[in-house]
Amino acid sequence: EQMTEHSFTADDQEFCRRCGVSRHLSEDDPDIRRLGCRPTWAKSWMDVAQIVSLRSYDRRLRVGTVIVSADNTQVLSVGYNGNFRVGPHQHESLEPGKSGFIHAEVNALVKCNYGFHKPKHMYITHSPCKDCAKLILNADIARLVYGVKYRDSAGIDLLESCGLEVLSFEEADALERQTKLYLN
């Protein structure tokens, strides 16, 4: 397949800076000439999780989750924190951890295609609580990437102690840039 030459302009460089691309941008880079500026998969999926979180009625904390195939080619499920399907769109309590809402991870896991027998990655705007971590371990998730660390690290601790790869968004994004996985 023949790729057309990409003209790398100052506008492209500014776009890349706004998107958070931190590596040196040069028209001499063959990947830049061929592809222009592209976000990493970690950034792409975390952006999707952020957008999904906007569907939440939780006024205190909106959380979004996306589950994808490990090769980044398929979205398997999305979820956000909220009430059960016909439930009211209101909190049981404004006290942290007692909203009564179903967690974003649970909503995504309930809808996930379990006939998909390949490694799955989960991107979540906030790290999971311990109860959600237990469900994640039962769901054959190979990697979890979180945006913001939850007030209690028990969920992350449990996942890591059971051998699940857990990365902050910053770690996942840097790893992809280092290995240039996002160019594929």
Task: Label each region the model flagged.
Residues 1-11:
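Extracellular adhesion/carbohydrate-binding repeat motifs centered on closely spaced tryptophans
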Residues 3-4, 15-20, 24-184:
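Zinc-dependent deaminase catalytic domain
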